[in-house]
Amino acid sequence: MHGPHPTVKDIELSLAPEDIPVCNVQLDEEDYTDAVEPAQQAYRVVTECTKCSLPLRLVVECSHADIRALEQLLLGTLKLVCPRCV
């Protein structure tokens, strides 16, 4: 539409969506599996204070692989201490 006054031929009343590809790059299967986050679940952990042997309870939310890693840490050198013994 040009000029000071619109004319009927300048007005388009029907618009149709156009299929325009946003990106031509396809996602590899490996990239797709990396994009999916592992399922998070709540785990209750019960252990003892390493100094006074009082029971300690905590809840963590993590993936299955992460809870296995925490288990290995607790069986190894990681020691939990209660607030009284700090």
Curated annotation (Swiss-Prot):
Gene3D superfamilies: 3.30.160.330. It is found in: Host cytoplasm; Host nucleus. Keywords: Activator, DNA-binding, Early protein, G1/S host cell cycle checkpoint dysregulation by virus, Host cytoplasm, Host nucleus, Host-virus interaction, Inhibition of host innate immune response by virus, Inhibition of host interferon signaling pathway by virus, Interferon antiviral system evasion, Metal-binding, Modulation of host cell cycle by virus, Oncogene, Transcription, Transcription regulation, Viral immunoevasion, Zinc, Zinc-finger. Highly phosphorylated. This is Protein E7. The gene is E7. The lineage of its organism: Viruses, Monodnaviria, Shotokuvirae, Cossaviricota, Papovaviricetes. A motif (Nuclear export signal) lies at residues 67-75. Its main location: host cell. A zinc finger (unnamed) spans 49-85. Plays a role in viral genome replication by driving entry of quiescent cells into the cell cycle. Stimulation of progression from G1 to S phase allows the virus to efficiently use the cellular DNA replicating machinery to achieve viral genome replication. E7 protein has both transforming and trans-activating activities. Induces the disassembly of the E2F1 transcription factor from RB1, with subsequent transcriptional activation of E2F1-regulated S-phase genes. Interferes with host histone deacetylation mediated by HDAC1 and HDAC2, leading to transcription activation. Residues 1-37 are annotated as: E7 terminal domain. The E7 terminal domain is an intrinsically disordered domain, whose flexibility and conformational transitions confer target adaptability to the oncoprotein. It allows adaptation to a variety of protein targets and exposes the PEST degradation sequence that regulates its turnover in the cell.
